[in-house]
Structures are given as structure tokens and as C-alpha cells.
């Protein structure tokens, strides 16, 4: 292998590692933490959005209701809340991984009807 090819190969590996690093950070929480977060989703989120997430004080959070909404926007809403509404920000109690997990669960259609 020539020096140039070796350098390009190493650069490619470094770039791939850099691009995949955020995916490692976004790994799902441990199983015990997931159970805690699922409970929080049903009890805390469900107290405003309905136990089946079909709406109540807050809007519906069903898979259909969230269809087309950008994941990043949903994460920002859970993180910072919605000023002027009853929706609080959860960043004081939950970290980024927890919030991403909750949003992903809702996008997957949790809780199942």
C-alpha cells in the first residue's frame, strides 16, 4: 500500500469514527432506566396528554398525531417546554438520552392501543 493510499485509508477511518460517535452517545438507556422512563411517560406525560396519549389538557401524542413532526423539534419541546402553555421543560430532571428515549417511544407508538 502506498503512503498516499494509507493516509487516505486512515483519514476515512477517522471520518467514519467521527460520524458514528454521536450514534454511540444516543444509545438507549439501561433496561431499568427504560422501565422508569416508561412509567414517567404514562404517569407524568399521561396526566396532561391522556393515559393513552390521545390528548387531554395537552395535545395527542400518538404516532399518528406526531407523524411528520421532526424528532429534533419534539426533543426541543420536551427539553425546554412551550412558553405560554402548561408544557414544562424537563431538562432539569432528565438528561438528553432520557428525553430522546421518551420521544422515540412516542414516535414508535407507545403506549400501544
From Swiss-Prot:
Main location group: periplasm
PTM section of the record: Binds 1 heme c group covalently per subunit.
Pfam families for the chain: Cytochrome_CBB3
CC terms in the record's Gene Ontology section: periplasmic space
Binding annotation for heme c: 45, 48-49
Protein's UniProt keywords contain Iron: yes
Record bears the keyword Heme: yes
Secretion signal, residue range per the UniProt entry: 1-26
Record keywords: Electron transport, Heme, Iron, Metal-binding, Periplasm, Signal, Transport
Compartments in which it is found: Periplasm
One term of GO molecular function: heme binding
Function: Monoheme c-type cytochrome.
The protein, known as: Cytochrome c55X
Organism: Stutzerimonas stutzeri (Pseudomonas stutzeri)
Amino acid at each position: 500500500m502506498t503512503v498516499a493510499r494509507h493516509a487516505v485509508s486512515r483519514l476515512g477511518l477517522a471520518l467514519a469514527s467521527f460520524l458514528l460517535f454521536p450514534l454511540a452517545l444516543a444509545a438507549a438507556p439501561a433496561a431499568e432506566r427504560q422501565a422508569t422512563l416508561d412509567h414517567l411517560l404514562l404517569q407524568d406525560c399521561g396526566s396532561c396528554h391522556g393515559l393513552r396519549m390521545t390528548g387531554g389538557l395537552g395535545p395527542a401524542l400518538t404516532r399518528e398525531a406526531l407523524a411528520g413532526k421532526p424528532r429534533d423539534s419534539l426533543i426541543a419541546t420536551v427539553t425546554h417546554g412551550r412558553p405560554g402553555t402548561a408544557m414544562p421543560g424537563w431538562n432539569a430532571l432528565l438528561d438528553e438520552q432520557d428525553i430522546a428515549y421518551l420521544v422515540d417511544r412516542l414516535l414508535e407508538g407507545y403506549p400501544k392501543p
